[in-house]
């Protein structure tokens, strides 16, 4: 039973880490577009950037929560 819970939490941690990587990549792409002259005046890019940053914050919070729960379960 405990092993099942640990495996589930490890899977959640891995999923969060994959989501963090994907979101960071998306942010980098948007930031590169924002650095161009035409991108600098594109408000949609700024809105997308803001949404991605908020999404990243949420995923990191989830990752921290699940990671702590995993550590507590292992100990």
How does the language model describe each region?
Residues 1-75:
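Charged, heptad-repeat coiled-coil alpha-helices that serve as long linker/dimerization "arms"
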């Amino acid at each position: 039973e405990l092993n099942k819970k640990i495996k589930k939490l490890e899977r959640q941690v891995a999923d969060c880490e994959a989501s963090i990587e994907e979101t960071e990549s998306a942010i980098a792409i948007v930031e590169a577009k924002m650095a161009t002259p035409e991108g600098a005046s594109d408000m949609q890019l700024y809105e997308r950037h803001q949404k991605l940053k908020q999404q990243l914050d949420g995923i990191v919070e989830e990752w921290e929560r699940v990671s702590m729960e995993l550590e507590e379960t292992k100990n």
